[in-house]
Amino acid sequence: PYRWLEDFTGEEVGAWVELQNDLSQKYLTKNQYRKKIKENLESIWVSNSKSIPQIRGGHIFYFFNEGSWQQSKFMTLACEGCNPEMLIDPNTFSEDGTVSLSSVSISPNGKFIAYSVSDGGSDWKTWKILKVETKETLDDQLKWTKFSSASWEPDNSGFYYLKYPEPKKEALSEINKNPQLYFHRVGSSQKMDTLIYERPDKPNWSWSIHISEDSLYQILSIGEGTDDRNRLYIKFKGEDTFLPIVDNLVATYRFL
């Protein structure tokens, strides 16, 4: 009976959402403690916060919020005691604040930042690359990614990411299957990306990749659906095939 609600952009769904909002606001505005709760929350929010720092290439990277920003800014320090510099301000992504910074991945030498952007809370992400020295966002744009990290090659040439086939119908409601693992080289078009791994025979599998510091191993962590357990596959440098280390969903495994 609720199938019609899957049409996110439909007028009927929009009208229903508006009615639901009106109903909830009528109830919430009657709460005699509403103003006091709001004031108390705002007093808590207005405080500086910093994320755990990461060090790459001698630079320190971290998220910072002075308390009133809707989204934290991504900052860098060239050295301890140096003045902080802002690299990414997601509050400028859109006027209504619906475009957010989802995740960041710093290249090993600290010269590039791969970061993903989400629009309207969607699981779909677009990956972009920032050059730290100039604070310039490059032309690289990687679309149709979802539930993906960016795993850098130790030589800083590029990173691996998970991509789904472009939806044929409605991007927000279509079921996504058959993800593919690609390698993107910094400064190139997504059309030039190299396909690293896919399993059309296992459409519900998804994976993340870890590259050893010496570049001798590529380790795939393979999940299935929402199961926390995973498989582990490995590929040695110079080889073409990933070999299973753990090929059954028995436990959760991590490569150290």
PLM features: what roles do these ranges have?
Residues 1-256:
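Beta-propeller folds
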